[in-house]
Amino acid sequence: MNLILASFSLAPCFCVRFFPSNHNNLNLLFPGQRKIQVSCGGKSEVLKSDTMEPHEAETFVNKRTLYAPIEPYSSGNLKVSDVHTLYWEQSGKPDGHPVVFLHGGPGGGTAPSNRRFFDPEFYRIVLFDQRGAGKSTPHACLEENTTWDLVNDIEKLREHLKIPEWLVFGGSWGSTLALAYSQSHPDKVTGLVLRGIFLLRKKEIDWFYEGGAAAIYPDAWEEFRDLIPENERGSSLVDAYHKRLNSDDLEIQYAAARAWTKWEMMTAYLRPNLENVQKAEDDKFSLAFARIENHYFVNKGFFPSDSHLLDNVDKIRHIKTTIVQGRYDVCCPMMSAWDLHKAWPEAELKIVYDAGHSANEPGISAELVVANEKMKALMG
């Protein structure tokens, strides 16, 4: 059998994969035998030989693991309004190419694992918690908390850190914010890496909260739905949850926040991840996640029209962009990535056939690392 050798550096070790050369386009290789070999310090070892399933055909090429855990070299708090102060941190290479990580939700906050998508020997990695989320204060606050406030915050943080321009990386709601920011400040963006596209249109909200996703997760859906009495469901569960998440009774807020968060966490992986689902039991996390997310959805993302992000693609058409989308994403179904791709064919679309929504699913995290590696080559 003829073999194609593909190797990709990941200091101090690199992964080498041998694939059957049954097609001259690596993205269209057919299933077959493969061997995975790791080289380190001049020594090589074949880890395993297995059979590639058909659903792997578009995701196995260039697969990479996440980078090793790292700690920030600096962090701080930036007051962005009379109400809000943002937590920020930097890790990686202080004089490297800047990249800003935009977390999901909105309200999800950042985590140490978010640093691991980027080569710390090349990138200056900037993470921050958006208004009301994570370590930013005040916690779960909805006042002065809109998409355009966040867009302005990103600019304030960039200026505070004296960064001329940066790569923008965002998934789920982070992709929404990345598009809004880059369309507002295209001259500050060197590239975009987007995951789990969410354009915050009515049909996307209706799919997830008004019964579409329930066809796939009817058991989890009933638990989410049944928190709301039948006589209060009306035409919108989002509105019914809004009432509870903003109740004067904190216990009512917590109960609604746990149910809202659990529904999303149950559906975020192709196979539900217990650790992820248990986040819903953390009242501090779930309150910010649910209240802020619901606040944005009730207000239609604070966009002037349902198709605002698609309508403004021309402003960023020239920016090098990779879109990574799980084929079986229930939270942000592929219709949104597909609509964006049709409006913006210049952007590369990578479909991960064995994944749902989460950036932590192996196929998605692999493609995200590859996308960041490709950006390195462009940025020198």
From Swiss-Prot:
Residues in AB hydrolase-1 domain copies: 98-360
GO cellular component, one term: chloroplast
Major localization listed first in the record, in broad terms: cytoplasm
Reaction equation(s) it catalyzes: Release of N-terminal proline from a peptide
Active-site feature positions: S172, D329, H357
Places the protein is found: Cytoplasm
Record InterPro entries: AB_hydrolase_1, AB_hydrolase_fold, Peptidase_S33, Pro_iminopeptidase
GO molecular function: aminopeptidase activity
EC number: 3.4.11.5
Similarity comment text for this entry: Belongs to the peptidase S33 family.
Function: Specifically catalyzes the removal of N-terminal proline residues from peptides.
Protein name: Proline iminopeptidase
Naturally occurring in which organism (per UniProt): Arabidopsis thaliana (Mouse-ear cress)
Lineage summary: Eukaryota, Viridiplantae, Streptophyta, Embryophyta, Tracheophyta
